[in-house]
Design a protein with these regions (language model features):
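Extended, helix-rich architectural segments
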Residues: 1-158, 480-484
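Extended, charged amphipathic alpha-helical segments
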Residues: 5, 212-348, 385, 397
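Extended, non-catalytic structural segments that build the interaction scaffolds
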Residues: 68-82, 292-325, 330-332, 341-366, ...
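Extended, regular secondary-structure scaffolds
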Residues: 137, 141-142, 147-237
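Short, surface-exposed acidic
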Residues: 330-335, 384-391, 433-444
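Substrate-recognition/cap regions that form aromatic- and gly/pro-loop-enriched pockets
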Residues: 370-386
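Assembly-interface segments of oligomeric complexes
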Residues: 409-453
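Extended, compositionally biased alpha-helical segments that mediate assembly or anchoring
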Residues: 441-484
């Protein structure tokens, strides 16, 4: 990392002048409104965007507790309207939190050139990128896509903005090349249309079909994270949450009907009289309700015997399929008990979760590489130059939040280090107790130097003591000689 003495403000000014000095015809054409409005107004109405936004809206509604079970009708019971049970389970939120935390609850580790890693860790800390990574993972798991724009704020701090999925419209050409990005939303109070159009070199802001601001794009198009499972339009990720919603609807429907059956048939059964009822006076001193029936008549409660085994079989199978599709160990949400589990058993228990999350991690690693390129651009504008060799040494690794036997792992790494098969830096990289490798290496080096200085000081003290003893011995001999 090398600092340039050139004023970064002047460098930024040159970049702006070069951008607007000779705008090409395509840029001018983009700002001209045609008979059908601007090009981006028709772009967001295309089927591929409408299809994706409708999926996002359905997921948002479900996460806001707007489930299909709420449409279940009431019925008449004992001459009154019986309000049916509408049990809503928000298990999907727990599934999203689990996968998000599994991927990013432990901060990612940067490895490579020691000096650059230390510098980037400071950039990550100032820009609150641990939280940004969590937001990216949550958007990706929930909707199949995530969008991040890297920028330089007013205080010259590198930050990222996570653009909401329902406001995001990535644009690609007929060859599948990502060429621009539209951020669109409608103001809830004024109902005004707001557009932010991202080009590779500039950002334009429109309010009610009027261009109100144009800014220089110092980085590039928003980073597009996309899941490996694709939707009908293969550029967009397919949210796996949509696979869980039908299963959850079935579970809610079964539980709601079961609740109604218990309430009506078991707790409030219907009374049935067979025969003729006699209307005659009843003594006033009798407590309670009495039915006068003619001889041979009968009164009993009508109740239904529920097939418990069949209900349990269906419900258990649906729940089993739900956790299989969600790729979550059933013990996480209290469906089974786990005790005295070995390291091998934990690995097997989380194998499906690992395979599921590795796909998202691969997409995020690709996006993080793009983020580092954008950070490099912003650092160059600030006067900090990074060589290709140093920049290419940087890599990002994820520390998934899987329960592991840390004692066993540290013991194995210690054995490898003692055999000369692993360095201290690799141990620090893989250790669950450290996140900043370069800082730990600096501290270890400082401790080593301090110990050497202490050892050297002790050695000098010992040497001085030996010399003093030798001098004392010579003096004694001289004194004895003179005495003789």
């Amino acid at each position: 990392v090398k600092n340039e003495k050139r004023n970064p403000i002047l460098k930024l000014g040159d970049h702006i002048k070069g951008l607007f000095k000779n705008p090409d015809r395509r840029k001018v054409k983009d700002r001209i409104m045609g008979d059908n409005g601007y090009w981006f107004e028709s772009e967001i109405k295309k089927n591929k965007h409408v299809d994706r936004i409708s999926r996002i809206s359905s997921i948002d509604e479900y996460l806001r507790r707007e489930h299909a079970i709420l449409a279940r009708p009431n019925f008449e019971f004992k001459g009154k309207t019986f309000e049916t049970a509408k049990i809503i389970l928000q298990t999907l939120k727990s599934i999203i939190r689990f996968h998000t935390g599994y991927i990013c609850s432990n901060p990612v580790s940067l490895t490579g050139d020691k000096e650059l890693v230390s510098f980037l860790n400071k950039v990550y800390k100032k820009g609150s990128y641990n939280k940004t990574d969590m937001e990216v993972a949550k958007e990706l798991v929930s909707y199949g896509d995530a969008f991040e724009y890297v920028y330089l704020d007013d205080n010259d701090i590198i930050r990222s903005k996570i653009i909401r999925n329902k406001d995001s419209y990535p644009v690609y050409d007929g060859h599948g090349t990502y060429i621009s990005f539209i951020e669109y939303w409608k103001d809830e109070e004024t109902r005004e249309d707001n557009y932010v159009i991202y080009y590779p070199d500039r950002v334009e802001v429109y309010e009610n079909q009027k261009l109100v601001d144009t800014k220089v794009n110092l980085t590039g198009l928003p980073i597009w994270y996309s899941a490996m499972d694709k939707s009908r339009y293969d550029k967009f990720g397919d949210p796996f949450i949509l696979d869980l919603i039908p299963l959850m609807d079935t579970i809610e429907n079964l539980l709601s009907k079961l609740d109604d059956a218990v309430t009506t048939l078991s707790l409030n059964p219907l009374g049935v009289v067979s025969g003729q009822r006699i209307d005659s006076s009843i003594p006033n001193n009798i407590v309670g309700t009495v039915l006068n029936l003619e001889d041979g008549s009968d009164f009993k409660y009508a109740s239904a015997d529920m097939d418990r085994d069949s209900i349990k079989l269906e419900l258990d199978y649906i729940i089993q399929q739900f956790f299989s599709v969600a790729c979550v160990p059933s013990s996480i949400l209290g469906q089974s008990n786990v005790s005295n589990v070995s390291e091998t058993s934990i690995t097997m228990l989380y194998q499906q979760t690992d395979n599921f999350c590795k796909q998202y991690i691969a997409s995020m690693q690709e996006g993080f590489a793009k983020r580092l390129e954008y950070m490099r651009k912003l650092l160059e504008i600030k006067g900090i130059t990074i060589t290709d060799e140093v920049f290419d040494s940087i890599s990002v690794s994820f520390n998934v939040n899987r329960p592991v036997d840390n004692k066993s792992d540290m013991k194995n790494m210690k054995m490898q280090h003692e055999c000369g098969a692993m360095s201290k830096q690799t141990i620090i990289d893989r250790s669950p107790y450290t996140t900043d490798t370069s800082l730990e290496m600096e501290r270890i080096e400082a401790e080593r130097i301090k110990e050497e200085q202490n050892t050297s000081g002790d050695s000098q003290e010992v040497n001085r003591t030996d010399a003093d003893m030798e001098t004392d011995s010579k003096l004694e001999n001289m004194i004895d000689g003179k005495a003789d």
